[in-house]
Amino acid sequence: MTHHDAQPSTDAEQSSNATLPHILICNDDGIEADGIHALATAMKKVGRVTVVAPAEPHSAMSHAMTLGRPLRIKEYQKNGRFFGYTVSGTPVDCIKVALSHILTEKPDILVSGINYGSNTATNTLYSGTVAAALEGAIQGITSLAFSLATYENADFTYATKFARKLTKKVLAEGLPADTILSVNIPNVPESQIAGVIIAEQGSSRWEEQAIERHDMFGNPYYWLSGSLQLMDHSMKKDEFAVRHNYVAVTPISCDLTNYAALAGLEKWKLKK
């Protein structure tokens, strides 16, 4: 695969856009998801866009990478026009392949999403959308992840407007090293948005269910399911804020160290 950058529709458009920021877009719902098409359309008003996304949905893949089998890159068209590239792997694979074999230089910013369903609380750990942004941060790229708090009847109107506005702000202000913004947006009209909160990652978690079924030979198999249980009741926490129609903007770090626990553990005086 030869290297490519964003492909505007004409040479004139490419020339006029050459000084605009270059935006790499990814997701975990796959390149056919409505969310990434809405995001790409919005980001084209901010800069030059390159879309590199999984060929198929890879939700809840977290920071998984593909090892032991090849990855394949293909150009993807929407309505007869070039839209982006598919990678036969995970969201993190997409970022790695984009930087090594699709783009000729690092993008100015990486924007992941728009995800179906919130990525708050412990969902942050499972999310391929967030992981793509974290991989961007690991690679030294300013990165954002956007999620819409619904799995059905998604309305991306306000989400894309806010994503565009925040992306411009981050391009102007920057972010601390190894830090992304995970942005969770209620699925309501703009008139019902209560505001924007700089929120902490909450503690809400899934109450798991493994539903047992049987195949034609009588062998059991299982579908993982469950429901997210609200464990925080503070507007400072992401899931609680989103449920009250606030946009939750949460800074997430690549560093998973629990610094508050270090002093106590040092008192254990562990020896070899």
Curated annotation (Swiss-Prot):
A divalent metal cation binds at D28, D29, S59, N115. Its cofactor is a divalent metal cation. The keyword Hydrolase applies. Its EC number is 3.1.3.5. It is found in: Cytoplasm. The keyword Cytoplasm applies. Binds 1 divalent metal cation per subunit. Keywords: Cytoplasm, Hydrolase, Metal-binding, Nucleotide-binding. It comes from the Bacteria. It is an enzyme of class 3 (hydrolase). Gene3D superfamilies: Survival protein SurE-like phosphatase/nucleotidase. Pfam families: SurE. It catalyses: a ribonucleoside 5'-phosphate + H2O = a ribonucleoside + phosphate. GO terms for molecular function: 3'-nucleotidase activity; 5'-nucleotidase activity; exopolyphosphatase activity; metal ion binding; nucleotide binding. One of its GO terms (cellular component) is cytoplasm. HAMAP family: SurE. Nucleotidase that shows phosphatase activity on nucleoside 5'-monophosphates. Belongs to the SurE nucleotidase family. This is 5'-nucleotidase SurE.
